[in-house]
């Protein structure tokens, strides 16, 4: 989901 994308983006 969108939250996952934000998580990977932070990494």
Curated annotation (Swiss-Prot):
What GO terms fall under cellular component here? extracellular region
> Chief localization class?
secreted
Q: State where the protein is found.
A: Secreted
Keywords attached to this entry: Amidation, Neuropeptide, Secreted
Q: Which N-terminal stretch is annotated as signal sequence?
A: none
Q: Which processes are annotated in GO (biological process)?
A: neuropeptide signaling pathway
Location of Arginine amide modifications: 11
Q: Which function does this protein serve?
A: Myoactive peptide. Increases the amplitude and frequency of spontaneous contractions and tonus of hindgut muscle.
Any idea what this protein is called? Tachykinin-related peptide 6
